[in-house]
Amino acid sequence: MFFLETSGRSWLTPREACALESAAASSNLKVNIIFLSDFVDLYDNSTCSIMKLLPNVSLFTIKLKNAFEDTPLYRFYQRDDFRNSSFKAVHMSDALRIALIFKVGGFYSDLDTMTLGDLSRLENVIGSTRMRGSGSHLANGAFHLDRRHPLLWRVMRGMVEVYTGRERGEIGPLLLTRAVRQHFNVSDLKSVRREGLHVLPSTAFYPAKSEVYIYPINLSL
């Protein structure tokens, strides 16, 4: 199971530590957190606690050149429109998760999640969700795909083709949804099941509606 810290920080926030702890405690999977920073600050309290308490959690750093090499995204992260984008961290996260799972296979999850059950039996699954104004679509916050799954190659090619750097979500969930429909030649996402990819209902990975999300940074006490 893989998590990504793409902001450039070398430590975990308490909320991120909770995501790792819940994943490590609820699942039989080995949990890996990958940082884009040059080093990991093991003296930070949250990071240190995770390493001491959870033996099935490992921390790594990664070089972008190695992550994107031999994929359609190899030149992507060097483009001017990517380097100058106001949403660089978001776009890096969207791209890196796809390249990583393409290369190694496995389960990916965002760092703002809580794992409440064993994920080790889930294979080739993507969760659906609903977004105001766009209806039902697939989300890229939690998914499992096999190593070198051809769908992931199509997603990466789509990223390169549509990227402008001007829209926050242009290579995120809606692109993933289009890629799945094109790859399996279906209009109804429920029809994908017979093709070896299981689309899970929103209650599986995204039970909370976006309207009830709480953003602590905006709270005034």
Regions found by a protein language model. Name each.
Residues M1-S93, S109-L221:
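Glycosyltransferase-associated regions of secretory-pathway enzymes
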Residues D94-G105:
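Small-residue hinge/turn detector
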